[in-house]
A protein has these predicted regions:
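Repeat-based scaffolding regions
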Residues: 1-222
Length: 222
């Protein structure tokens, strides 16, 4: 009986894959709904439905992924929740998905994840003229991260401003604030000197005038 059930399960997935390949959305979802009666974890059900909808470029997939990730979070399965958002973000650069991913990485204090998700979110927000939203995000996250991560995060923000917001009239202020954060960190941890130099190198490649101003600011501050 178990072998029969396993074979039926496998056949059902082959049918779903076939319907997806043939572009038959409703038939794929019909088989999926029948199959989900045998799946005990709701998060998996929503995640798989999101995968099917995503294959048909249906924006409803994002809603399913949000539900799946929230269910994983409630169950304490943080890595699964992050994986759902990462998967969704690979196929759809969505502001809400990337904001949720950023918040997840903040919660688990994953520095690389925090920085990478913020960079991706910054690009979208600045292209949509939502700079103030990003500034609020920086303020909100500042109480949740260490000083070094905060400096690196502001460096990402400055880079994004120079890349995607040519009208950023307050760029000098943001650069000076980022330099202050780095210099404060360097008082206690010289290992982050390379991070400051990376920031200056990026600045030089993107805006030579601001780079020269940054060097002057550092020389006056030290």
């Amino acid at each position: 009986m178990r072998t029969f059930a396993s074979e039926s399960y496998t056949i059902a997935w082959f049918k779903i894959a076939d319907f997806v390949a043939r572009g038959e959305k409703e038939r794929a979802l019909h088989v999926y709904r029948l199959l989900m009666h045998s799946v005990s974890e709701p998060a998996i059900s929503y995640q798989l439905e999101g995968d099917i909808l995503l294959a048909f470029d249906d924006d409803a997939a994002l809603d399913r992924y949000h539900v799946a990730a929230n269910l994983y979070k409630k169950a304490g399965k943080w890595q699964q929740a992050i994986s759902v958002y990462e998967h969704a973000g690979l196929f759809k650069e969505d502001e809400k998905i990337l904001e949720a991913l950023f918040d997840m990485y903040l919660s688990v204090k994953n520095r690389i994840g925090i920085l990478e998700s913020f960079s991706r979110l910054s690009k979208i927000c600045l292209q949509q003229k939502k700079k103030e939203f990003l500034i609020q995000l920086l303020h909100r996250s500042s109480v949740l991260i260490d000083d070094a991560t905060q400096a690196l995060l502001h460096a990402r923000f400055v880079r994004s401003l120079l890349l995607y917001d040519e009208s950023a009239v307050e760029i000098s202020m943001h650069i000076q604030h980022t330099l202050d954060l780095f210099l404060n960190v360097l008082h206690t941890d010289k290992h982050h000197e390379k991070d400051l130099q990376k920031f200056l190198s990026d600045l030089k490649s993107l805006h030579d005038y601001e780079y020269e101003q940054a060097k002057k600011y550092i020389s006056l501050t030290l």
